[in-house]
Each structure stands twice: as structure tokens, then as C-alpha cells.
């Protein structure tokens, strides 16, 4: 048979390639319950570890893609290839999902990296590029024009990318710490709690960070104006490369269905409630601080809205499961903002504690947090409204009218 979309399916960077292949045994039951996992090497390996003859697994062609040209995406053909079963028969999907979850986290971090590098380049360009005068009057009167970083919309694009990078880093590092505890903590109960939280956050890391990466790289290309569209400047490559992150290792729609359908409604909101309690505890601790009101008040308000929204969607889904599909993508983005708001509030707390230190690091953190709460978090109001609009506006159009 053949497999398509195999990343790095053929290359000469290592002596051997080990392909993990999902396949069906001759007597396997139908459907996903009959899929097994096999290890299929490019070269057969001897008992002593030495490489032997070529296995019957070949690259039949390369995909011609929009981006990620540094990765050979292959069409792989297997005809009589020799493979070794991994795990038990007919339980290949369960084994594969161990790797899929790690890959999804990796895609989120990949998106985060593209967000950061695009931001860093755009900042340098915006400080150097002269164009127009500020609407309020010249900011660099000694120059023929002002640097474009003085213009409000350029600032908005740069700050959006910066906020998505900083919020994304906080989420990625927090999730990595949870994984460390899940794997290594001596207390089994703590390991279980961390595993549950990682399960909840994984689709958010993958989908929210990759959605944000697409937005951020597009904004940063826009900062360059026409030069951003020119290949030699490098910005358009970040945009092209970021687009795949919303598609592979499970599309972001699949991530949203996983979050809402399995991770939230699947356990009657137990995982989400645990995370919500962390937010509630933080809000209670910091609610007495006047300086923290601009952060904890909208955080608490959004937490309450997510709780109510989840209940409403759950009740609709009980009547018609398609309601989950209608709300899931917007719901994940709301949850992503809730998580970011929590981390930005925590970062703001630390920054406020060091505000008199004179360190620009803390001043920048506080400013970024304020931008996020003022300019990005309000997106949730519209998303919640579209979630509540439900299934009917999507499905009432007769198929023949498309």
C-alpha cells in the first residue's frame, strides 16, 4: 500500500530511517479497532545491530507545498516490506496517540518560535523604516520622516505578536512543567492530576498557539509593507511556514472537538473545573490588591462566562451532538484567551512587585499585559456570542443552494 504526507519520509541525513506505520492484520476487526502499529526500517537491521539489505519501502514522490520546504514531505510505497509489531495487535491507534500528543505540543512550540522570530525581525524593521509623520506631529524632526514604529496601527501589530509570543511561552513552559511532574513526581495522585491538566491544555497549546502564529506572522509581514511580500526579505516564508501548523498533527478543528467534546464535556467538565479553581484561587488572593484590579476583574469575569457557556453548550449537545461541532472552534479560542489571561495576570503580579526596580524587563511585561487585556482579550465577547448562536445558522442553508 501507500502512505502520503510523511514528513522527512526519505533523506540521507542518517544511515537508517525507522517508519512507524499503522496497518491492518489480515484477520483484524473492521474500523479503528483493527489497526496495529508496526516499525518498518528503511534498511533491515541484523541481530548484531548492523544494517542489512534494503527493505521494500520507498519514496514514490515529494509533495509540492506552500511552505516548510526544509522538510521533505513524501509519498511512501510499501510492497512486501518487513515490519515489527509495536505493542499489542489491533491497539495501534492508542500507541500512536502517545506520539501524537507530543507532536501536537511540538507544533504549538513551532508556532511560538515563528511568532517570536517574525516579531523580532518586524521590530528591527519598524524602528529603521522611515515613512510619513506621526499624526500628532513629527517624532524625529531631524529625519525626513518618522520611523513607522510611531504609528498606532504598526504598534498594534507589533504588540499583538509580542503578546502572543509571551503568553504562548508562559503556556508552553507551564505545560512542560506539568509533563515533568506527570512523569517523575513520587505521588501517584499528583501524577494523575498533572496528566489530566496536560490532556486539557494540549489541544489549546496546539490550536491556539498555531492560530496566533498565523495572525502574528501575517501582522509582522504587514509591518514590512511591500517588502514583506518579497521573498528576499524572508518575512513571507514565516507566513507560509506557519500555515501548516493549523493543519497537520490534527487540524485545529479536530483539536477544538477534542477539547470541547472529549476533554470538557467528556468528563462533565471535571478537568476544566480543576483549572478553573486555580484561577479562582489566584483571583481571591489578588482581589484585595488595587493595582491588580485591571487584571483580576476581567479574568474572573471571563472565568464565570466560560463556566456558563460550557453548561449551555453541554445542554444543547445533549439534544443534538452537532452543537459541539458548531461551537467548538470558537470555544477553544475563548479557552485559550482564558488561559492567557491567567498567565498574563500572574506575570503582571510579579512585574508590579518589581516596578520600582528600574528594570525595563518588568516594565515591558506590565505594558504587554495591559495591552493584552485592553486589546486582545475583548475578542472573547464576540466569540462567546457566536458560540451561543449555535448550529442553526450553519445548517439551515439547503445543500443544493451552495
List each model region and its residues.
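A glycine-rich, basic-preceded beta-loop-alpha segment at the flavin cofactor/substrate interface
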Residues: 44-60, 65, 72-103, 123-149, ...
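Gly/Pro-rich turn-and-neighbor structural signature
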Residues: 2-5, 151-222
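C-terminal amphipathic alpha-helical interaction region
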Residues: 266, 281-402
Amino acid at each position: 500500500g501507500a502512505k502520503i504526507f510523511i514528513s522527512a519520509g526519505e533523506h540521507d541525513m542518517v544511515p537508517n530511517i525507522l517508519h512507524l506505520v499503522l496497518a491492518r492484520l489480515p484477520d483484524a476487526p473492521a474500523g479503528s479497532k483493527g489497526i496495529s502499529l508496526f516499525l518498518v526500517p528503511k534498511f533491515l537491521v541484523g541481530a548484531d545491530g548492523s544494517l542489512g539489505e534494503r527493505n521494500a519501502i520507498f519514496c514514490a514522490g515529494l509533495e509540492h507545498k506552500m511552505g516548510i520546504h526544509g522538510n521533505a514531505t513524501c509519498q511512501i510505497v510499501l510492497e512486501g516490506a518487513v515490519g515489527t509489531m509495536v505493542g499489542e495487535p489491533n491497539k495501534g491507534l492508542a500507541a500512536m496517540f502517545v506520539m501524537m500528543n507530543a507532536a501536537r505540543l511540538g507544533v504549538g512550540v513551532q508556532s511560538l518560535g515563528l511568532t517570536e522570530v517574525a516579531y523580532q525581525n518586524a521590530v528591527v524593521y519598524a524602528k529603521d523604516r522611515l515613512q510619513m509623520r506621526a499624526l500628532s506631529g513629527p517624532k524625529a524632526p531631524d529625519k525626513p520622516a518618522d520611523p513607522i514604529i510611531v504609528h498606532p496601527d504598526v504598534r498594534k501589530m507589533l504588540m499583538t505578536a509580542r503578546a502572543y509570543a509571551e503568553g504562548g511561552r508562559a503556556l508552553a513552559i507551564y505545560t512542560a512543567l506539568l509533563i515533568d511532574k506527570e512523569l517523575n513526581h513520587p505521588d501517584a495522585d499528583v501524577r494523575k492530576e498533572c496528566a489530566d491538566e496536560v490532556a486539557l491544555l494540549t489541544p489549546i497549546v496546539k490550536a491556539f498557539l498555531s492560530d496566533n502564529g498565523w495572525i502574528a506572522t501575517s501582522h509582522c509581514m504587514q509591518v514590512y509593507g511591500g517588502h514583506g511580500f518579497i521573498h528576499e526579505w524572508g518575512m513571507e516564508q514565516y507566513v507560509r511556514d506557519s500555515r501548516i501548523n493549523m493543519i497537520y498533527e490534527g487540524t485545529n478543528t479536530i483539536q477544538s472537538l477534542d477539547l470541547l467534546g472529549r476533554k470538557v464535556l467528556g468528563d462533565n467538565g471535571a478537568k476544566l473545573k480543576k483549572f478553573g479553581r486555580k484561577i479562582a484561587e489566584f483571583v481571591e488572593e489578588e482581589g484585595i490588591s488595587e493595582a491588580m484590579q485591571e487584571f483580576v476583574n476581567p479574568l474572573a469575569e471571563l472565568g464565570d462566562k466560560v463556566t456558563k457557556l460550557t453548561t449551555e453548550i453541554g445542554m444543547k449537545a445533549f439534544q443534538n451532538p452537532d452543537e459541539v461541532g458548531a461551537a467548538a472552534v470558537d470555544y477553544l479560542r475563548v479557552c485559550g484567551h482564558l488561559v492567557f489571561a491567567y498567565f498574563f495576570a500572574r506575570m503582571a503580579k510579579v512585574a508590579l512587585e518589581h516596578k520600582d526596580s528600574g528594570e525595563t524587563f518588568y516594565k515591558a511585561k506590565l505594558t504587554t499585559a495591559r495591552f493584552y487585556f485592553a486589546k486582545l482579550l475583548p475578542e472573547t465577547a464576540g466569540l462567546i456570542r457566536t458560540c451561543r448562536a449555535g448550529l442553526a445558522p450553519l445548517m439551515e442553508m439547503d445543500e443544493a443552494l451552495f
